[in-house]
Amino acid sequence: MKRIITYIFTIIISFSVCSCTQYSNDFDLKKDTFNINKVSFDKLNQYLLEQFSNIENSELNFTFSVSEETGEIEKLYSSYSHEYIYLDEDITELFTNVKNSFTYDFSIVSITSTRISYGGEGNEMFVYSLDGKKPKYFWADNKDAAFSIYSLDNNWYYLFLKQR
């Protein structure tokens, strides 16, 4: 009986260690990908703040419009002004670079007084904290979804659902 309990305990510990290692490896890969595209993230932050920080609204959300011909992001749709914002080639390239950091969908940018969030279908997000504080919520359909937060760099965080 002791052998069976020891065997079961060993299996449980093994699965736990493997699971933690997988998350660590996933995060290391995500951090490397972020670092490759960090300049694009930072330039987009600067662009977004210059263009939209003067708007009096608690949250600005933008979704992408993708060209049917090229498959590239060509404009943003503003849910605040209900209009399309056409992007020049340099900004389009920055969005394309940022998109390469995502394993899942990247289709939304959200700006609040405390953060700029890059995300999509609610599986993962890159968040820049404007107030220097760790993000406290994950932008997803299920507001109670369990998520993890990893610090990437000064004020940059990677958030992802624990069960995807």
Which sequence ranges carry the predicted segments?
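Bacterial Sec-type N-terminal signal peptides, specifically the leucine/valine-rich hydrophobic h-region
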Residues: 14-17
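N-terminal export/targeting and maturation segments
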Residues: 19-95
